[in-house]
A protein has these predicted regions:
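Cleavable N-terminal export/targeting peptides
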Residues: 1-33
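Outer-membrane beta-barrel transmembrane domain signature
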Residues: 23-53, 64-65, 79, 94, ...
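Selected alpha-helical membrane-embedding segments in polytopic membrane proteins
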Residues: 60, 64-69, 74-84
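Short, acidic/polar
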Residues: 55-58
């Protein structure tokens, strides 16, 4: 199962169509001075840009800057309405997920996205999120989360406010590997998405 997730992520990154960088493993906080790497295949069902939806992928590297903050660098590719994209995310987990309480955090994200009409789009978003992990059978742990990314998108000298709702979960299969499943739905001038992926942490 894990090999299938990894192969799907690699193939979609090499031969991708339209996609949008999602929440993915932001709530799965990386410890101080540790790191994680993940592949995020994604289907985009609709966009407010010309070109419609498609299928693509993002690769993301996360590093634990402090005991309460992470830095993530992402790069992706696609066809349809969106092509190459690159950006970064700074996340602050101000209430850790511990026994008896949910985890709360916020992430600030900036991405440059090359569109297939030869123009470009720049996004600046905030990602408030809440998550809570719990054990299931055979030592596996689910870490479901809800996030509401919102912010500004700049394109061709204009800007607009955007907002999306996101529901997803990480599945901890062992100490190092996480599987990810996520759906996002348009609230205001954004995309509806479905993604799955895999990440590895040291």
């Amino acid at each position: 199962m894990i090999k299938a997730f990894f192969l799907l992520g690699l193939l979609s990154f090499l031969g991708a169509s339209s996609s949008q960088a999602g929440v993915f493993n932001i709530p799965e906080f990386v410890d101080y001075q540790s790191w994680a790497f993940g592949l995020e295949p994604e289907i985009t069902f609709d966009t407010f840009e010309k070109g419609g939806g498609g299928f693509g992928s993002n690769a993301k590297f996360t590093y634990g800057l402090t005991p309460l903050s992470n830095l993530q660098i992402g790069i992706g590719t696609g066809a349809g309405s969106r092509g190459f994209r690159v950006g970064g995310t700074y996340s602050f987990d101000f209430i850790p997920d511990m026994e008896g309480q949910v985890g709360l955090g916020v992430a600030a994200q900036g991405y440059y996205i090359k569109l297939h009409d030869a123009s470009a789009r720049t996004e600046g978003l905030l990602y408030p999120y809440v998550h809570k992990s719990f054990g299931i059978r055979n030592g596996m742990i689910l870490d479901p989360y809800v996030a509401v990314p919102f912010g500004m998108a700049f394109h061709s000298g204009t800007y607009r406010t955007v907002m999306q709702g996101v529901i997803g979960t990480a599945i901890r299969t062992n100490e190092h590997v996480r599987l990810h499943l996520e759906t996002g739905f348009n609230i205001k001038d954004y995309d509806s998405t479905l993604s799955l992926g895999i990440s590895y942490r040291d």
